[in-house]
Amino acid sequence: KDVAVTIEQNSVIARHPSGESVTVTFTPDVALTQTGNNYTALVHSPKHPVHVAISFFTSEKEMTAGLQNIPTLLNNPEKALQANAERWEGYLAKILRKDMKPEYDRIAVKAVTTLISNWRTHRGGLLHEGIVPSHAVGYFVGFWAWDSWRFSAGTAKFDPELAKNNIRAMFDYQQPDGMVIDCIYTDPSENNARDSKPPLVCWAVDEIFTHTGDTAFVSEMYPQLLSYYKWWYDKRDHNRNGMCEYGST
């Protein structure tokens, strides 16, 4: 009910009070009409496939710039579709194995599809791109610590830059004492600095190094990782037996 729908030129625009928007852009031969928050798109004499561009923007400024690029895309949709197909084939070429059974390949494809579909750009309080755990409920649409470590370990093989940035996003909010907090959001007031999650991040960094050999990234992360692990033994080994616990502060 908070979303405002308008038709502007060949685009249907749904604006959210947060500043985010979703646009559906048609070619000029499609007639658009609006009734309330509903719209109708009518093709009078379809002689060829109708292509539509669906876009998500995080601000009005971003939307204005993005919509200017869409006519070029719709004038040559085959080029964009080919680039998209090559992008996905590039992901899969890095994870599918000839020694895997077909049923395992299907699971691998599903895993890649889920990770990439949950990929979100940097915006607001999220200073780097990353992957959200789920869209099932609103509080999952943020970055969570141990989810991010696993996501980064998983994407290291087929999109290492995304894997690196997902880790950086969590360490953007590392506390002065070394703690990496539970979860972060576009609105930092919703961040949870009360809880911690198991420290799987060195595994994720090692996976990135294994697949890229990027020593610069390891050097970048090392001081933060060391501070993080010192925090665990200072603040989470309550009985000083060398085994850390996790929970709330």
Model-identified regions with their sequence ranges:
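Acidic/polar, glycine-enriched structural segments that form the non-catalytic walls/loops
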Residues: 1-141, 215-233
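Aromatic-rich carbohydrate-recognition surfaces in CAZymes
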Residues: 141-249
